[in-house]
Amino acid sequence: MSAYTHPMERELSGLSSRGNSELGSRYSIESGCYMTSLAASIFIASLVTFGVLMITLLIALSTMLQSCENRNIAIVEAQRLDESFGYCKILSLHSQLNSLDEESELPLLCRDVALHRIKQGIYLRELNFTIQMALTYFQTIKPMNDNCDVVVIDIDDTNLLEQDSYYMKYIEEAKHQKSILILALYSKLRSQGYSMVLLSRRPETERNATIEQLKSRGYSDWSHLIMSREDTRQKEELERGHRVIGVIGNHMDVLRGQWNWQSKRLFKLPSLTYDDVLDYNER
């Protein structure tokens, strides 16, 4: 009996020892499945990677939704601005036809439209385009050598928007850029042989002050300085002795109305006043 028992005990002892060593390198699961440490590490890493991917996907979706929402808001704002533009355009045209004060006639909504136009850079783009259009026209014709071919430039631009502190930096920058562009236009036309005539709304009593101001801004060698828009006699005298090739003005009343220039071409420059809404077009 002991002879048979001894080998059997050795076998059971070997099985027990082998089982203990295998359990040392495996994780036991109640279902009876076993997982090595390497497989467990891979499984955990996969879960972490999947979680990171899901978070990244959620962030991407959130960003896309926010972008779409912002785009929709921008479209709605543009539509509202277009509607406001049409509304202000009618009121502005009515004010000009009846020689009314636009500052008192137009609502603050129109003021906001004009301010947005300046802030978004539309004003300067339109100004530069108009100046280039004028230069292109004057380059197609050649003034005669008798110094009788003149170009009239309106040098006034009454700024009704300076009170708004929020837009002040945009307005000041627009004014600065405009002064540079207009002076360049003036110098270019003068170099082509045109006699330059400057037009101001200021009263005759401010002529000397106006001359000094023009010189300080870089203007020189003009042939005439017409003062006071209420007195058209200076304009009539100019037309009797000169050929007005073109008139470049900031305001409609300078180009039409009582002035009624006998000019070959009129150019309306965008200005920094309420009547700009006539030229406003959201792009």
UniProtKB/Swiss-Prot annotation:
Keywords: Membrane, Transmembrane, Transmembrane helix. GO terms for cellular component: membrane. InterPro entries: Acid_phosphat_B-like, HAD_sf. It is a single-pass membrane protein. The chain crosses the membrane at residues 41-61. It is found in: Membrane. Its main location: membrane. Residues 1-21 are annotated as: Disordered. Belongs to the APS1/VSP family. PANTHER family: ACID PHOSPHATASE (PTHR31284:SF22), ACID PHOSPHATASE-LIKE PROTEIN (PTHR31284). This is Uncharacterized protein At2g39920. It comes from Arabidopsis thaliana (Mouse-ear cress).
